[in-house]
From Swiss-Prot:
This is Chaperone protein ClpB. One of its GO terms (cellular component) is cytoplasm. Residues 159-340 are annotated as: NBD1. NCBIfam families: chaperone_ClpB.
């Protein structure tokens, strides 16, 4: 025996067989050890060979196991192993038959045939399993298709298509492919290219998620249904799995050998096989190592001669980046562009897929959910493509409903938790002997009995509902299988079976399903996916509130001005304009191609421009920090525009993205504040033009960022001198022309023309100060509340602070400084000195024109 003459797989089999013999304590290395290892091969090559020769591999395996169990065990033999004469004859026979067939290497199937001929006891097992050496040899020759074993990994090339490709036509025949709706034009164009004499290789090019792979699956379904021209009838469509082709190819040349074997089988099929290569750009450079040839170069000759029918699929970017660079490869393929379907087409696609998802999740999907998935995904999910994003929405919403059905209902869960608490309390009270505890125990018993009754009733109801949903799910699955059987029976011409399914079994199942679905409307858990479930998933993905508004939220929105007035004083016109924009958006009546609203706030310093923006963020998101604030004084240079949208290619920071675009990509629904807008460089306004007009902005990496769900607010002090010079109570509209002249002198007309509303903020009057003092004091009280302390200011103290803090030029900001200096600082000193204790009320009044602090009154 010359081990160098054996292929890698055969060497491995012999070594594993020796290890098996030692592990079982056998002193003799017998043919049955080799047979056992061959039957346990990972890819089952020997088993497949026995099966195709008409044998029973499981019976053979059982016989080998019995034979090995009878072999005497020797413990402590020190790992000595002797070759049985039968084994030597097996190796000699394998080498002889390999030489006779012109093979350079002995392969695993030669060993299998040799065991069947010369294996002694093991050879008898083959006869019992219904297979002879002759039938095995015939099956091996059929599997090899006339090829000789001229390399150490020759087995890798056997039945290469079975190993490295998936039969799409077989999957279509078994009903495993999703139905393909529409896309007739693209499928027709693909068929036209495939029917050419040479260069008959279409490549489907389109954005990710538009349905390129689905078009090929649609072609497979059409081939199975015979809905193709004569030239494509009875063809097989196989999908090449590049992953398994490359996986495990350790040595140089192994990958090329596998690919050559695949191409050889396709060529030998003489045009009856069409190869589909998904993610075609992976071919370019695949397998390329030191001096090795990459996959695309191996394909080119076969493609050019028309021997290889191939359909590729790749995205526009990958095609440009990888395939177009290789002009020789690109010219052998004919591009077929796949565009994104419209919302109407997406609705049709979803209606066709609905049944498959209903069967998988065991829930019902309403038509309103399908329409909502198409429209909401198109509007709110900007960085992905239809129909993929709409299908994902339906899938996730269905999974959510299924999870709710399988989980315990919230109401029942609360009752069960309360029961556990009460039972623990009962155990504790049962040991007490006083009258109060006994009374409490009696009350507990009554409450426990009541809750237990409700829990039992609800549990029984929930389980019954679950069973009903389970029954409906089983009926749907059976219906799906029957429809696939019906299609197969019609194709095979078995019209008796087709009639039985169509007019007997399917109607009976449909009746059963209708009964199961005619459920009670007061179900504990929802069984139907509707538009609201879809909206909830969209909200989770994007943060945009698109669910149906609850009654409380409606009330809140209608009284929005009153809420905001709690923080911003004396600017009613501004509050109204902003509130109207938010209400428009939540009622779904805003222009879908523009931001929720864009405002320019003009007014003197300290009148509440930035404060209104913060209070708006708190009102909408219950979080003052839910705001992207751009201080435009940082964007005074021309080059600072790149900080907003990201650096261009070739510059440092290209991968990081822009400050503005990244913030909106992560959180599409928020308030964007451009503070002190007039301080920015004029080029910054050019960037904002498309944001204000189309609600979108393209960042440095070419990605489109969606601003349609943002509220854009810009603040400025331009023309503030006119507003500041007004008398108390004077209408701001009187000075609007002068203010607008100043604004027009600074901003371009095309920028101003795109802003929804330019709002003038009034100068704060003295009578506004009382409300502002109260708002500012609330913040101080909040800080004191942590120490269980409270403030009590009398009317005189409030007036004193308002007078002292009022400055018509600087607005409310001086008041903040006055409160800090005259109120907070003295309290801080008294706290540190121990004059005020925690848990007291600090009484503040006015004495001799200054604030005075009374002794803390203990609560």
């Amino acid at each position: 025996m010359n081990i160098d003459l054996y292929s890698d797989r055969a060497k491995q089999a012999v070594q594993s067989a020796q290890s098996l013999a030692l592990a079982r304590g056998h002193q003799q290395f017998a043919p049955e050890h080799i047979l056992k290892v061959l039957l346990e091969e990972k890819d089952g090559l020997s088993r497949a060979l026995i099966q195709s020769a008409g044998g029973r591999p499981d019976q053979l395996d059982g016989g080998v196991e019995t034979l090995l169990a009878k072999t005497p065990r020797v413990d402590g033999a020190g790992g000595q192993l002797y070759m049985k004469p039968d084994t030597a004859r097996v190796f000699a026979e394998a080498e002889k038959s390999a030489k006779a067939a012109g093979d350079a290497f002995v392969t695993t199937e030669r060993l299998l045939i040799a065991i069947a001929k010369e294996g002694g006891e093991a050879a008898k097992l083959f006869k019992e399993a219904g297979v002879s050496a002759q039938s095995l040899e015939t099956a091996a020759n059929a599997m090899r298709k006339g090829r000789t074993a001229d390399s150490a990994n020759a087995e890798e090339g056997y039945e290469a298509l079975k190993r490295y490709a998936r039969d799409l036509t077989a999957a279509a025949r078994d009903g495993k492919l999703d139905p393909v709706i529409g896309r007739d034009e693209e499928i027709r164009r693909t068929i036209q290219v495939l029917s050419r004499r040479t260069k008959n290789n279409p490549v489907l090019i389109g954005e990710p998620g538009v349905g390129k792979t689905a078009i090929v699956e649609g072609l497979a379904l059409r081939i199975v249904n015979g809905d193709v021209p004569e030239s494509l009838k009875d063809k097989k469509l196989l999908s090449l799995d590049m992953g398994s082709l490359i996986a495990g190819a350790k040595y140089r040349g192994e990958f090329e050998e596998r690919l050559k074997a695949v191409l050889g089988e396709v060529t030998a099929a003489e045009g009856s096989i069409i190869l589909f290569i998904d993610e075609m750009h992976t071919l370019v450079g695949a397998g390329k190592g030191d001096g090795a040839m990459d996959a695309s170069n191996l394909l080119k000759p076969a493609l050019a001669r028309g021997e290889l029918h191939c359909v590729g699929a790749t995205t526009l970017d990958e095609y440009r980046k990888h395939v177009e660079k290789d002009a020789a490869l690109a010219r052998r393929f004919q591009p077929v562009f796949v565009s994104e379907p419209t919302v109407e087409d997406t609705v049709s696609i979803l209606r066709g897929l609905k049944e498959k998802y209903e069967v998988h999740h065991g829930v019902r999907i309403s038509d309103s959910a399908i329409v909502a998935a198409a429209t909401l995904s198109n509007r709110y999910i900007a960085d992905r493509f239809l129909p993929d994003k709409a299908i994902d929405l339906v899938d996730e919403a269905s999974s959510r409903v299924r999870m709710q059905i399988d989980s315990k209902p919230e109401e029942l869960d609360e009752i069960d938790r309360r029961l556990v608490q009460l039972k623990i309390e009962r155990e504790a009270l049962s040991k007490e002997t006083d009258a109060a505890s006994k009374q409490r125990l009696e009350n507990l018993e009554v409450e426990i009995d009541d809750l237990q009754f409700r829990s039992d009733e609800m549990t029984a109801r929930w389980k019954a509902e679950k069973e009903k949903v389970g029954g409906a799910a089983q009926a749907r699955e059976a219906l799906d299988r029957l429809r696939a059987d019906l299609a197969n029976a019609q194709r095979a011409g078995d019209f008796a079976r087709a009639g039985q399914i169509q007019y007997g079994e399917i109607p009976a199942l449909e009746r059963r399903l209708a009964e199961a679905e005619a459920g009670d409307t007061q179900a504990l858990t929802p069984e139907v996916v509707d538009a609201e479930q879809i909206a909830a998933v969209v909200s989770r993905w994007t943060g945009v509130p698109v669910e149906k508004m609850l009654e409380g939220e409606r009330e809140k929105l209608l009284k929005m001005e009153d809420e905001l007035r709690g923080r911003v004083v004396g600017q009613d016109e501004a509050l109204e304009a902003v509130s109207d924009a938010v209400r428009r958006a939540r009622a779904g009546l805003q222009d879908p191609s523009k931001p929720i609203g864009s405002f320019l706030f003009l007014g003197p310093t300290g009148v509440g421009k930035t404060e209104l923006t913060k209070s708006l963020a708190e009102f909408l998101f219950a979080d003052e920090a839910a705001i992207t604030r751009m201080d435009m004084s940082e964007y005074m240079e021309k080059h600072s525009v790149s900080r907003l949208i990201g650096a261009p290619p070739g510059y440092v920071g290209y991968d990081e993205g822009g400050a503005l675009t990244e913030a909106i990509r992560r959180r599409p629904y928020q308030v964007v504040l451009f503070d002190e807008i007039e301080k920015a460089h004029p080029d910054v306004f050019n960037v904002l033009l498309q944001v204000l007009d189309d609600g979108r902005l393209t960042d440095g990496q070419g990605r489109t960022v969606d601003f349609r769900n943002t509220l854009i607010i810009m603040t400025s002090n331009l023309g503030a001198e006119y507003l500041a010079s007004q008398e108390d109570g004077e209408d701001v509209e009187a000075v609007r022309p002068m203010v607008m002249n100043t604004v027009r002198g600074h901003f371009r007309p095309e920028f101003l023309n795109r802003i929804d509303e330019i709002i003038l903020f009034k100068r704060l009057s003295r009578h506004n100060m009382g409300d502002i003092v109260r708002i500012q004091l609330q913040r101080v009280e909040k800080l004191l509340a942590d120490r269980r302390m409270a403030l009590a200011l009398d009317a005189e103290a409030l007036n004193w602070l308002a007078d002292k803090g009022y400055d018509p030029v600087y607005g409310a900001r001086p008041l903040k400084r006055v409160i800090q200096k005259e109120l907070v600082d003295p309290i801080a000193k008294k706290l540190l000195a121990g004059e005020i204790e925690d848990g007291g009320v600090i009484a503040v009044g006015v004495t001799d024109g200054q604030l005075s602090f009374g002794k803390a009154v203990l609560q």
